[in-house]
Each structure stands twice: as structure tokens, then as C-alpha cells.
Amino acid sequence: LPGDLETYGNLTGWELLTYFANIRGGVDWHYTETLAERFALDLSRTIRVLSKGNKQKVGLVQAFMHRPELLILDEPTNGLDPLMQQEFYRMAREATTEGRTVFLSSHALAEVERIADRVGIIREGQIVLEEEVVALKAKALRQLEIHFAEPVSTKAFRELPGVRGVFADNSILHCTIEGSVDALIKIASQFEVVNITSHEPDLLQD
């Protein structure tokens, strides 16, 4: 599915899907109708009168309707409202649960983080990084706030590897950490800890 779908504007949604179904073959029309219903899509309307979002829905139905083993989608939620984006996410997860592969291109990193198991980052036409999302986030910086019962010295925390930006605000210690928090927690456990707040990293930080 291309990012900007351009197709036969004089056909209705049903006619367009029938055209592609005849090329591909083996389409389950009940499943196709279900996809259209999930997107609240009226397939009786002519393509040229549809909004950008509805054209995108037609494209998504066309991409999913024959249950391909590999889906290649470029900016698939382009033009979709938030509710329809959520529906697409569910459909993508269903496909992967069934053992099919979804290859997704997107500039919306929150969307990639929500759907993908692995992520590749392309810069100037070259893949500069490819890794599982969980592993990538584990390497990212996270913000920690440790609330102590009373003020503590920051010296021991400043000396820990991977820990930076350490400062205290009364009895609250703030820091940024890369990687494991084990060493930090061991130091903190020497004092009376009231609460720990962790601001988890997202892909936008990487």
C-alpha cells in the first residue's frame, strides 16, 4: 500500500476491490465486508468523491482482504482519524498474531513503537540501525526520580556508570540513566525510599 493512494476514480469501492480480487484470486468476501465495516466504509460510493481518509481505508481493505503472508504498508494511517488509526493497529496486531509479517514505513515513531517488534532506521537511503524495539528502548536514556524520607548525598549516585545529570531537590533525587538500574537501586536501598518514578523512554529519544 503506497503512502498516497492513487487509483481508478470512476469506480466504486466495491468495483475496485472486485478488480483487485479478480487479479489476485482467493478472496473471502465475507472477510472483506467485515474489514469495510470495521472502517465504517461505504463501498458503494465512487472513489473520486471520497475523502483522503476514506480512500486510505479502501487501500487498507484492499491490502488486507486476501490475508497476505507479507503486508508492505507505507504511512498506512495517513489521513485516518484517531478511531480508525486504533482499528488499523488492531488489524495489524491480528495479522502478526496469525503469523503474518507486517512491513511498515512510518514517520510517526509512537505508531512504530506501538505496532512493531523490530525497527529499522533509515538515514539518507541507508539502514543505520536495526534492532528489536524492546532492546532499543533498554539502551535509551530514562529519567528517574527517587523520593527519600529525608535528603541524601548525591556523591555515590554521581559515581555510578551510566548515570548522569544527578541533582537533589530537597529529599527528591533526579537523574538520567542509560541501561540497567540495578546499581542505582542498590545504592538507593541504603536509605529509606518513599517512592521511585521512572519516565520510560520512547523511540523518539533514540
PLM features per residue range, with description:
Residues L17, Q143, I172, V193-V194:
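Short active-site oxyanion
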Residues T176-D206:
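C-terminal coupling/interaction segments
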Residues W14, L109, P151-T154, V181-D182, ...:
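Alpha-helix N-cap/helix-start and coil->helix boundary motif
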Residues A21, A40-L41, A156-L160, L184-F191:
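Alpha-helix C-terminal capping segments
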Residues F88-T176:
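ABC transporter nucleotide-binding domain
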Residues L1-R123, I127-L129:
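ABC transporter nucleotide-binding domains
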Residues P68, P161-R164, F191-E192:
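Structural motif
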